[in-house]
């Protein structure tokens, strides 16, 4: 076929129905189905690239699709009210900022994992990262609205925690948000319910004034990942206090949240936070060439481990456009986080018109 004049072929507000596929000669053809979940590995040394499928995500997509069609069986009354409010066709048409399909699918997948009836989750095992607390990851392209998904996670968790305080599902009204830098931390302040430009009001996340009022009781702490670094003793200190204890660390990092237990953690740009496998032998120079800060990655997770030890992390939600970590198989290869449960990548975002598209030369 002739080269396309536009790469945008899907609506941002409905599930993708088609995608561009690449022929052997690098030309494009239109496939009449949603793009299977996957990612691309590029070897710059060999000038090659290959597609790696994520079959687990494809299976989860189908389960979530069926669960949605059946009316989300198993959800609490609060969760059902939220899902109906977010999906309501009449409300969507009059919303100033309607939700993208990828945002709804991301939050639905997290809810499905915790609340769907067992038959909708039967046979599905999500591999963790080897740590003691559960992690789930939404793979979402930059520009697809990750911050809104974080606001939806907080709304869902907090309202359920306050409504069902004895629920065995361990919802939490205490949320610890970890940002990859000070600029992002400043941008995430809109996730504080009392912020004048908060996302809960901007995106009309609560179906009633009563629930919106209840949401104000959320305890949300937003910190830069550097807060998770061990405390260094001043070099000129006369009195040697010794290494900071785990309890002192938890109190210092969590501040007002230090009185809480069973926290929910949200990692923004979570590709900065992973456990370095023992078989990964990377020098600092090699890591830098891959765009990896090994110290940041390990310190980030080590800090969360210490918090889990003292306060317990009910679950951890990771959001990232590039949730990859070194595999140890080669210096140029990175592997996908094994706890990715949804995928809306850069190509999907381009085809839905959510990010700027490269100019197509005809």
PLM regions and their residue ranges:
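RecA-like P-loop NTPase motor core of helicase/translocase proteins
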Residues: 1-362
């Amino acid at each position: 076929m002739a080269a396309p004049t536009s790469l945008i072929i899907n609506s941002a507000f409905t599930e993708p129905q088609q995608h561009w596929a690449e022929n052997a000669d690098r030309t494009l053809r239109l496939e009449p189905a949603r793009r299977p979940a996957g990612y691309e590995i590029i070897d710059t040394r060999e000038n090659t690239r290959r597609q790696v499928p994520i079959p687990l995500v494809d299976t989860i997509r189908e389960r979530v699709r069926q669960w949605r069609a059946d009316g989300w069986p198993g959800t609490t009354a609060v969760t059902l009210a939220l899902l109906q409010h977010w999906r309501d066709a009449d409300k969507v048409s009059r919303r100033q900022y309607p939700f993208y399909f990828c945002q709804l699918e991301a939050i639905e997948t997290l809810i499905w994992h915790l609340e769907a009836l067992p038959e909708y989750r039967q046979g599905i095992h999500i591999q963790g990262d080897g740590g003691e607390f559960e992690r789930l990851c939404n793979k979402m392209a930059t520009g697809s609205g990750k911050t809104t998904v974080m606001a939806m996670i907080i709304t869902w968790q907090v309202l359920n925690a306050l409504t069902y305080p004895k629920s065995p599902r361990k919802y939490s009204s205490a949320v610890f948000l970890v940002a990859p830098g000070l600029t992002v931390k400043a941008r995430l302040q809109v996730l504080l319910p009392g912020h004048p430009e908060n996302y809960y009001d901007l995106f009309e996340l609560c179906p009633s004034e009563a629930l919106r009022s209840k949401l104000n009781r959320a305890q949300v702490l937003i910190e830069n990942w550097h807060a998770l670094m061990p405390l260094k003793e001043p070099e000129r200190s006369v009195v040697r206090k010794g290494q900071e204890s785990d309890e002192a660390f938890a109190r210092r990092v969590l501040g007002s949240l230090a009185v809480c237990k069973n926290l929910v953690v949200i990692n923004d740009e979570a590709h900065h936070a992973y456990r370095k496998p023992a078989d990964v032998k990377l020098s600092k120079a090699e890591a830098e060439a891959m765009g990896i800060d090994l110290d940041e990655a390990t310190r980030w997770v080590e800090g969360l481990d210490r918090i889990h030890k003292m306060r317990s992390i009910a679950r951890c939600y990771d959001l990232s456009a590039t949730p990859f970590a070194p595999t140890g198989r080669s210096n140029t290869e990175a592997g996908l986080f094994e706890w990715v449960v949804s995928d809306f990548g850069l190509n999907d975002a381009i085809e839905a018109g959510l990010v700027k598209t490269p100019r197509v030369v005809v």
